[in-house]
């Protein structure tokens, strides 16, 4: 099994679990993260309440949150790539694009490649993982957590291969 295959298995497991999105989340266990710490991490009380509502709705629907971790988009990608010894350090979506990917065309992406959003390649603000069949896994936001989304090429500005940079 390749490192790319291991990465895809791990990121899909997190998406299946629907882990929460928290600004600055880098894989901290939810059950070990005090609620005041989440409030400190979030940019506003409104965003903090959105996170709380997401967690509450998942629990009220019967989700087992004991193994959940908190993520933001770059925290999710860098955590997994660091665990698999693909990259050496944590960074932003922009940093992932600049330092840890071989830039490729959005037309030639394959499962495990990363896709990026932003105003342009010098102002990247979001990263997700392409998993094939026009689907991505992303730490989408406070109302959605880590989830599967449809890949719509026109919504993304760049792509990169983190396994061959």
Question: What positions do the PLM features span?
Answer:
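N-terminal capping segments
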Residues: 1-84, 137-139, 163-164
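...with weaker cross-activation on analogous glycine-rich loops/strands in unrelated enzymes
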Residues: 2-8, 78, 85-153, 162-165
């Amino acid at each position: 099994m390749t490192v790319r295959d291991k990465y895809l298995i791990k990121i899909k497991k997190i998406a299946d679990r629907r882990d929460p999105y928290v600004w600055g989340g880098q894989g901290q266990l939810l059950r070990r993260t005090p609620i005041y710490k989440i409030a400190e991490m979030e940019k506003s009380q409104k965003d903090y309440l959105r996170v709380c509502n997401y967690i509450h709705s998942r629990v009220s629907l019967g989700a087992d949150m004991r193994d959940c971790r908190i993520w933001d988009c770059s925290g999710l990608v860098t955590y997994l790539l660091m665990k698999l010894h693909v990259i050496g350090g944590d960074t932003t979506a922009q940093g992932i694009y600049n330092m840890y990917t071989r830039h490729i065309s959005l037309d030639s992406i394959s499962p495990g490649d990363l896709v990026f959003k932003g105003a342009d390649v010098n102002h990247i603000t979001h990263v997700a993982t392409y998993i094939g069949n026009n689907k991505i896994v992303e730490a989408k936001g406070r109302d959605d957590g880590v989830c599967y989304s449809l890949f719509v090429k026109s919504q993304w500005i760049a792509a990169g291969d983190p396994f061959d940079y």
